[in-house]
């Protein structure tokens, strides 16, 4: 068993394990979940909170799919196969991507779930406009994201041969890819409420 501390010096990462660790050894952050009245903070919130929100939908969904994918962070993954399966079994024309985005200059804690107008990829404007109008009508707090970088499983939907609209909707975190990822509980709550609302209205 290897247990050590991560040391950051500029752009370089080091460990303090007393001997050399074999190349290719997979290390992970020790989990330390902290929850107070405003935030949840832990390692690996990105992905886990997207899954949490999707699991909440399993309690109420009537018509639709709740799909859990793998390897999105590595580019590609299970989405192409799953899209083929879905479109053969019970086709859909719309997809909402439940995941976590980043705090940026234009996206802040406690201001609601983030609806992404674009990241590295651009969903169809007519669809994102409809989502924004519906969420405005709902009164659920939300904020808009316009970025040139980043991505999600929406990429696989966009590049698929199927005529499907998609939109990324998720809470934002800061201290990304660290053991201290941090998400507002209010934003997470609005994320779950928005998904429940949109599944009824779309």
Task: For each feature predicted by the language model, list its residue ranges.
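N-terminal hydrophobic/helix-forming segments and targeting peptides
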Residues: 1-202
